[in-house]
């Protein structure tokens, strides 16, 4: 596998594995995602998990579209979100525009290392190694 083209070896798609999380509350699938300016961005469609540590690393947030048509997907590092006290929704620590202008993710193409790096850099985070 060439550098920058394949997925980080220890991240797996939670929807496509029987892996369980060390902390079950980290399964954020289905939760609505809001921005700091209270605008709804979308919802968590999937979670990428560190296979060895069994911890959530990246959220796949789906936004827009009608019946799946025109839907866009964005990756958000879990460090960028906070869960409300009732646990029913997440807030990204940025305005809605910041998230919707982030590098777009195509679930059909899978998670590639170069996109992961771009997402972590976009949010000012270090790429995990």
Predicted regions and their residues:
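Peripheral interaction segments used for macromolecular assembly
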Residues: 1-129
């Amino acid at each position: 596998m060439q550098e920058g083209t394949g997925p980080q070896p220890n991240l797996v798609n939670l929807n496509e594995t029987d892996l369980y999380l060390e902390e079950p509350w980290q399964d954020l699938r289905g939760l609505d995602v809001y921005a700091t300016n209270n605008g709804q961005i979308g919802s968590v469609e999937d979670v990428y998990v560190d296979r060895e540590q069994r911890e959530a690393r990246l959220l796949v947030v789906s936004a827009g579209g009608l019946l799946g048509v025109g839907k866009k997907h964005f990756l958000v590092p879990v460090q960028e979100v906070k869960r409300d006290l009732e646990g029913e929704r997440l807030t990204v620590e940025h305005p809605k525009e910041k998230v919707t202008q982030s590098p777009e993710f195509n679930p059909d193409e899978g998670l590639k290392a170069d996109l992961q790096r771009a997402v972590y850099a976009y949010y000012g985070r270090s790429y995990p190694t």
